[in-house]
């Protein structure tokens, strides 16, 4: 992978994907299983302009059939567009980000975005925000652009030595730059990290920016009508075990206490190139040192 200014110029390498910080921070908490298709078709969601129903996805959901997702009633999708690696600090695009934005948009699902940060300075956080704004500029980003940062207490994290105040400054720098670039900023974290300013100075962040809280009740929505997080929040991720038509893997499911009548215009006038899904998104590759011997003679040539 060639790196320019700490930004990886390729979107898919085994080395870089192995250093994906989200890969090591999934499954810390497990939510209740939810069949989203059954939930929405049953008419259990409040029909209100102030409450909307969505999912958040990354390459870990594989190739998504967005027409089926749309038919299930999902109204919005928060799509991971990239991450900064936890060891080398490279910014890397999620290998299915453009495909997911393209297809969700084409099927009438309103889209937002999120970025998985491992920034260690406010300058790096601003760099991440600018990278995100440039990357999504050709798409109709109606929902917020969120900052996601986890695993910072792991000894192998490049953020391990940061103080809570430094992490918060870094998050605010990202969110402020996203706002300056014309998008709605939002901060994502788990309930136990935000409550009482436990791991973040939430009281500082919530004064200006939307909060997206992750909190998984044992009995999911709609039986549990709302999160028990008592802080201000605009979006609630209530399980990571959702079942949605068109998605082969469990998916995070969200309730937003806001919606949009229309769809935002893309910031760029350039039409995005049509892309295909990353066929290798769910494949695991291992290094081997084996000798392969052909059973039959094979003639290789470089012309027909």
Question: Where are the language model's segments positioned?
Answer:
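Substrate-binding cleft of extracellular glycoside hydrolase catalytic domains
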Residues: 47-175, 179-181
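Gram-positive cell-envelope targeting signals
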Residues: 1-2, 178
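Distinct, well-ordered alpha-helical segments
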Residues: 125-133, 194-204
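Hydrophobic anchor at the start of a short beta-strand
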Residues: 111, 184-186, 211
